[in-house]
C-alpha cells in the first residue's frame, strides 16, 4: 500500500470518532497526516449504544445518512420499576448508525487532506531521533512509517500509549463489559426517549439501555461483574426484566460486544511526539459510559495541537502539553464528578436505588447533578451518607 511507504508529520492510530476528528483537524491545518485502522472497514465492528449529545459544534449537520433518531430525554427505572422521566425543551442528542457515522468522519478527514490506510495494524513503536517509527502490519507484511507525531486513538485496548511509556492499560474491573442486540419489533414507551434500567441484579456496576433507532432499537447493557458474562445478564433482562412484555415480540438483527473504560482519564495523555485520545485516554464518562462526543472533541484538540507543533517545528513534550491543558479545561471536572457519582451508585443497595428514584420524583427538566443531590438529601435524608461530600 503506497500510503505506508512515506514519511508523515502526524500518524493517527485508530479511525473511530476521536481518530478521524484528530486526522481532520491535523490535515486541515496543513500537517501531512496518515490515519490507520486495523479493521478492513471503518466503523466495523460496532461496539457501543450509538448515542451522542451533539454534533453541530463540530461543523456537522444531522444528516439522514447516519442519524437514526433524535433524542429528547430519558426515562430512568429503579430496580422495582419506579420511573423518573428527564426531558429538555430542545433536542438532547442523536442515535447514530456508527458504521456509517464513523466512515463519514473518516471521509471528511480524507477530504481535508489526510491519507487513510485500512486493515493496517500498529504492532510496535520505536523512537528514531526526533521521529517515531510506527511499525505496522498490512496483509502479512511489515512496514515502518516514520512520523513526527503519533496520536494514539486505538481504543480501550490501546497499546500505542504503552509503547511510548505512558500508563494506559486498564484492570479488568476498570472496564465495563457491554453486550447489545439491535432488535426489531420492540414496543417503545416513546420513540424519542432513551430508557435506562438500574439495579444490582439486572446490571451490577452498570445499567441496561433501550435506545430507539427508527425501525429498530438498541437493547443492551454494561456490567462490571465477575459472576456472569454481559450477554447472560442481557438475555435475563430480555426474558424477565421490567421491559419483558414490550420485548416479547422483539427479535435481534445484529449483536455487538465491547468494553468501556470507566475508571476516569489516564494519568498523562502526552509525551514527546505523542498524544492519547478517546477511550485510550479514558476520556469517557465513568457514569454513563458515553464517549463519542468526548472522543471527537479531544480528537479535534489533539489534531490542532499536533499541527501547530509541526508549524513550530517543535513536537516536544513541552509543546504538546497544551493538548492536556486544553482538554482538561473543558472536560476534566465533568469526568471526575461522574467518577464520584458512579462510585456512589455502586455502593447503593436496590432498596436505596428505589429510594433515590422516589426522591428525584417522576419528572425532571434537564440534568443538573448538583440539583439532583440537593433534592435527594432533602427528600431522603437517609441517603446523606452517600452524597454529603458532594455538597
Curated annotation (Swiss-Prot):
Keyword Plastid included in the entry's annotation: no
Cofactor note: Binds 1 FAD per subunit.
Residue positions binding FAD: 18, 37, 48-49, 51, 98, 122, 279, 291-292
Signal peptide: none
GO CC, alphabetical: membrane
Tagged with keyword Magnesium: no
Short name of one Pfam family: GGR_cat
Reactions performed catalytically: a 2,3-bis-O-phytanyl-sn-glycerol 1-phospholipid + 8 A = a 2,3-bis-O-(geranylgeranyl)-sn-glycerol 1-phospholipid + 8 AH2; 2,3-bis-O-(phytanyl)-sn-glycerol 1-phosphate + 8 A = 2,3-bis-O-(geranylgeranyl)-sn-glycerol 1-phosphate + 8 AH2; CDP-2,3-bis-O-(geranylgeranyl)-sn-glycerol + 8 AH2 = CDP-2,3-bis-O-(phytanyl)-sn-glycerol + 8 A; archaetidylserine + 8 AH2 = 2,3-bis-O-phytanyl-sn-glycero-3-phospho-L-serine + 8 A
Superkingdom classification of source: Archaea
Alphabetical list of InterPro entries matching this protein: DGGGPL_reductase, FAD/NAD-bd_sf, Geranylgeranyl_Rdtase_fam, Geranylgeranyl_reductase, GGR_cat
Requisite cofactors: FAD
Keywords: FAD, Flavoprotein, Lipid biosynthesis, Lipid metabolism, Oxidoreductase, Phospholipid biosynthesis, Phospholipid metabolism
GO biological process, one term: membrane lipid biosynthetic process
Functional pathway: Membrane lipid metabolism; glycerophospholipid metabolism
The protein's Enzyme Commission number: 1.3.-.-
Molecular function via GO: flavin adenine dinucleotide binding; geranylgeranyl reductase activity; oxidoreductase activity, acting on the CH-CH group of donors, NAD or NADP as acceptor
Additional facts recorded: Reduction reaction proceeds via syn addition of hydrogen for double bonds.
Family: Belongs to the geranylgeranyl reductase family. DGGGPL reductase subfamily.
PANTHER family: DIGERANYLGERANYLGLYCEROPHOSPHOLIPID REDUCTASE, GERANYLGERANYL DIPHOSPHATE REDUCTASE
HAMAP family in UniProt: DGGGPL_reductase
Function: Is involved in the reduction of 2,3-digeranylgeranylglycerophospholipids (unsaturated archaeols) into 2,3-diphytanylglycerophospholipids (saturated archaeols) in the biosynthesis of archaeal membrane lipids. Catalyzes the formation of archaetidic acid (2,3-di-O-phytanyl-sn-glyceryl phosphate) from 2,3-di-O-geranylgeranylglyceryl phosphate (DGGGP) via the hydrogenation of each double bond of the isoprenoid chains.
Name by which UniProt lists this protein: Digeranylgeranylglycerophospholipid reductase
Source organism of the structure: Methanocaldococcus jannaschii (strain ATCC 43067 / DSM 2661 / JAL-1 / JCM 10045 / NBRC 100440) (Methanococcus jannaschii)
